[in-house]
């Protein structure tokens, strides 16, 4: 059922994540189901439709695209969720303004080895806590409930708290006595894992395209979700894990 609230439009639907962790679609013009949104930074008026309950479907692709938002070009990670009704793309920046890996991308990487691609998932960003301006910057990814009265099953993160080679942040103190954190080792490790999955999805989708081309003219068959990928360590030796 894709978006757990009805999402009007064609077969492709595009979503962003706000600073407060809201999953939303936006429009420059008024639309049914969209509410006026005024940017606190610029005062610009747009129209948002928020999807509080996330996106449901099969994780069918992850890729990196260069996009132009408000005249600024940047690389975005596009997370593609698919079901029988269409495709749903969640776009988040690949990098931070300081040159690190975006926290949503690292959050996705933490889950990837444990996601069974043959099962429907639900993906939803964590929302900002009451009184906080910004969200923590991570996703919740669960297996979708199988019955209307069932419950989603939260997927365990494969990489967390130094497990499976995931480096902790490195804490230090500047000359003024203020604490600061270095994420270089963590970002390097996360990006190596991320690149492996980009290649896996690319290879699988190319294979699917070839099979689709060979089957032109044949009796159509129902599409099946992509196979689950076996967990592999990064191709390069990961940086050491640091204890806080």
Language-model regions: role of each:
Residues 1-95, 100, 105-113, 128-176, ...:
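OB-fold ssDNA-binding interfaces and closely related basic DNA-contact patches used
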Residues 214-244:
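Intrinsically disordered, low-complexity repeat regions enriched in Pro/Gln/Gly/Tyr
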